[in-house]
């Protein structure tokens, strides 16, 4: 298990990817304690002085003007968690719940939330014990924070709801016992601090980012294999072309292709003096299209990296001045827009890959047997696999519609503009699955095309990509049940089998 000493506000994208990928043992850096304690003392002073402060001794949302008596403050926090745990849908996977919890711990530990170390330590204990609260997929509009998902996360601390441990559902009290805990009684402000925030939205989008990075890497490898399979040119990847334009994503993408393709190969030397002048756009313009996608990934990663370390609670406690100020950091618009841009990139990666698959099907364009199989007519080869790729790419065009432009007023129009960031983030997973399927078919097709080049080898790195597939999926000498081969290629891509072929430093979290 990975061990991480958390210094609040300093999580890196690489650490976030690791937290999403596998269980982690957290320890809070000792430097966090003074700020946490000071914020709690500030809240306690406000109560002692009988000052009115939103979320501490008032109602919530449209009920913010309702003053709550001091003897009801603990009940207020418990009622808040119970009433807001109103999500619906399938439970989130452990990897997502873990990421949400670590993001919440990171935010609360910065010392602007007025929540005791005891509560933060309880969340840490759950993470370390691999006890993951039941959080339904749906129920948040991304403002005022991810209230329903985070309420479900918080239920377990109160001894309510349920949690998963080693694949089994336990009651909250059983789950707490596994982590060596007992149910907590929340103090003033603590329920609101737990519920307010963009941690679910951010986790949803971060998963989409990690998937998109792996898809980008796979698309570069598959695109390089396709260049070789159809006897394409290396000239479009010449650094001078891309430096002349100046787009950094394009420049770096072209460099990735040069690294994978090398200066030459047996395949490229076999058509060195051919009379073909230019390749189709799906081959020639890969640096331009994939470079634009890389730029979107990097920009989204920057936004999400900031949000992962943000304080998105409301109100915020500024202990040094003794102030508690209401604002709107819970509004997840930055996350929604980042997710929307990731959707564009994921859709385009799949769209370009589908065009290369189609190119390989056409004997006039590819100089390969129709549908990549010999004895055509008796054999249909990749004919319907390409149709599947087209269906997946088409689905993604609809799914890529932006969510951040949508809004529905909630809480009796008090919360009259919302981000829809959770929906923006979670559709990325389906889109990634679709694009992974398209790339799997291209990978199968490009390797088949290279096989048909009668023993010619491509570059050393692309041969690794080829053999990674061929170690699991055999060449097609005749038609066979196709779906299992696509499933195996998808499985390999989901494991990141091609991600390691990219040079270090290209992708934000790798």
Swiss-Prot record:
GO terms for cellular component: cytoplasm. It comes from the Bacteria. Keywords: Cytoplasm, Histidine metabolism, Lyase. SUPFAM superfamilies: L-aspartase-like. It catalyses: L-histidine = trans-urocanate + NH4(+). Changing residue 144 to A/T: Complete loss of activity. PROSITE patterns: PAL_HISTIDASE. InterPro entries: Aromatic_Lyase, Fumarase/histidase_N, HutH, L-Aspartase-like, Phe/His_NH3-lyase_AS. Pathway: Amino-acid degradation; L-histidine degradation into L-glutamate; N-formimidoyl-L-glutamate from L-histidine: step 1/3. PANTHER family: HISTIDINE AMMONIA-LYASE. Homotetramer. This is Histidine ammonia-lyase. It comes from Pseudomonas putida. The gene is hutH.
């Amino acid at each position: 298990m990975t061990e991480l000493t958390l210094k609040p506000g300093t999580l890196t994208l690489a650490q976030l990817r690791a937290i999403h990928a596998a269980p982690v043992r957290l320890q809070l850096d000792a430097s966090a304690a003074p700020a946490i304690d000071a914020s709690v003392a500030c809240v306690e002073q406000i109560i002692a002085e009988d000052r009115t402060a939103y979320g501490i001794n008032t109602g919530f949302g449209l009920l913010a003007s309702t003053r709550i008596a001091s003897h009801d403050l603990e009940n207020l926090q418990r009622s808040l968690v119970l009433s807001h745990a109103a999500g619906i849908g399938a439970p989130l996977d452990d990897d997502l719940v873990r990421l949400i919890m670590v993001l919440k711990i990171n935010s609360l530990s910065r010392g602007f939330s007025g929540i005791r170390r005891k509560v933060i330590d309880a969340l840490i204990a759950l993470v370390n014990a691999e006890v993951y609260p039941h959080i339904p997929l749906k129920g948040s509009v991304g403002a005022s924070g991810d209230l329903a998902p985070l309420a479900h996360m918080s239920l377990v601390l109160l001894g309510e709801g349920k949690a998963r441990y080693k694949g089994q559902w336990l009651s909250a009290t059983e789950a707490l016992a596994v982590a060596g805990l007992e149910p907590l009684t929340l103090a003033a402000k603590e329920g609101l601090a737990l519920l307010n925030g963009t941690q679910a939205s951010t986790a949803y989008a971060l998963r989409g980012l990690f998937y998109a990075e792996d898809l980008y890497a796979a698309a570069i490898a598959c695109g390089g294999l396709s260049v070789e399979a159809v006897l394409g040119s290396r000239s479009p990847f010449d650094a001078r072309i891309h430096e002349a334009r100046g787009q950094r994503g394009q420049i770096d993408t072209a460099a990735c292709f040069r690294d994978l393709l090398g200066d030459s190969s047996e395949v490229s030397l076999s058509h060195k003096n051919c009379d073909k002048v230019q390749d189709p756009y799906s081959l020639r313009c890969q640096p331009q299209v994939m470079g634009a996608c890389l730029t979107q990934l990097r920009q989204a990663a920057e936004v999400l990296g900031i949000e992962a370390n943000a304080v998105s609670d409301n109100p915020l406690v500024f202990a040094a001045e003794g102030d508690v100020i209401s604002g709107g950091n819970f509004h997840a618009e930055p996350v929604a827009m980042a997710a929307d841009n990731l959707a564009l990139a994921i859709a385009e990666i799949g769209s370009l890959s589908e065009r290369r698959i189609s190119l390989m099907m056409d004997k006039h364009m590819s100089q390969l047997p129709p549908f990549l199989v010999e004895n055509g007519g008796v054999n249909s080869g990749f004919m319907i696999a390409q149709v599947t790729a087209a269906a997946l790419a088409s689905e993604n065009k609809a799914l890529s519609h932006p969510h951040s432009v949508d809004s529905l007023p909630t809480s009796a129009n008090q919360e009259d503009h919302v981000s829809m960031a959770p929906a923006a983030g979670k559709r990325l997973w389906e889109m990634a699955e679709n694009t992974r399927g398209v790339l799997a078919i291209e990978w199968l097709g490009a390797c088949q095309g290279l096989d048909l080049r009668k023993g010619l080898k491509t570059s050393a790195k692309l041969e690794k990509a080829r053999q990674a597939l061929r170690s699991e999926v055999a060449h097609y000498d005749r038609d066979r049940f196709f779906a299992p081969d696509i499933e195996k290629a998808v499985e390999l891509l989901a494991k990141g089998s091609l991600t390691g072929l990219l040079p270090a430093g290209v992708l934000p979290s790798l």
